Amino acid sequence: HPDEVEAMKEADMEELSHMAKEDKVVAIGEIGLDYFRKEGNAYKGIQKEWFCRQLDLAKEIEKPVIIHSRDAAEDTIQILRDFRKKNPQIENPGVIHCYSYSPELAKEYVAMGFYIGIGGVVTFKNAKKLVETVAQIPLERILVETDSPYLCPEPNRGKRNDSSQIRYVIDRIADIRGIAPEEVEKQTEMNARKM
């Protein structure tokens, strides 16, 4: 997680590389950038450095990535643009976890091959951009998420989140798109298996 990179050492990267090669590992993440809690160019530089190295590890072991990006839209998209430009052969780069940016940015991520992770926030009253995003991107590029234990959907907002809450996310996506919840469930399950 980006919040933890300040303490990372080279030995940690070596251990991560070793663990990532285990058969049970299906993706590398959460990796990315988080400028919400700490400010400053030095801290941003450290995050960017480790993010790029973790992307390279995922490429090396041929695993998708789970991207965390909070208050770091421009830096995240630029790093991923550069990564995809150098690695166009990667068919399934990963998911932008707990997506919270604009529909336009989501479309660019989708064009790069990423899935867009939609969680409990889509049920919140103030989630206008996310609702627009869900309406505008292909259902074939959406994954449903919990972000457990955080961001529990309405009507249970503020409580501990878990996988039993995913139904509310599916129902909201179906409502936004004007389709049956079963269609959302079927397609997003196929998406998750494909990723």
Model-assigned labels for residue ranges:
Residues H1-P64, M112-Y115, G120-K125:
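Active-site gating/metal-coordination segments in enzymes
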Residues E15-V26, L80, R84, Y109-A111, ...:
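Acidic (Asp/Glu)-rich catalytic clusters
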Residues I28, G32, I66, V95, ...:
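Generic enzyme active-site microenvironment
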Residues I28-E30, A58, Y109, V134, ...:
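Conserved, mostly hydrophobic/aromatic
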Residues L57, S164-M195:
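Mid-to-C-terminal alpha-helical segments outside catalytic/metal-binding sites
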Residues P64-R84:
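Glycine- and Gly-Pro-enriched alpha-helical subdomains that act as flexible
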Residues I79-N126:
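Active-site core of metal-dependent hydrolases
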Residues E140-D162, V184:
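Short acidic/histidine-rich active-site segments
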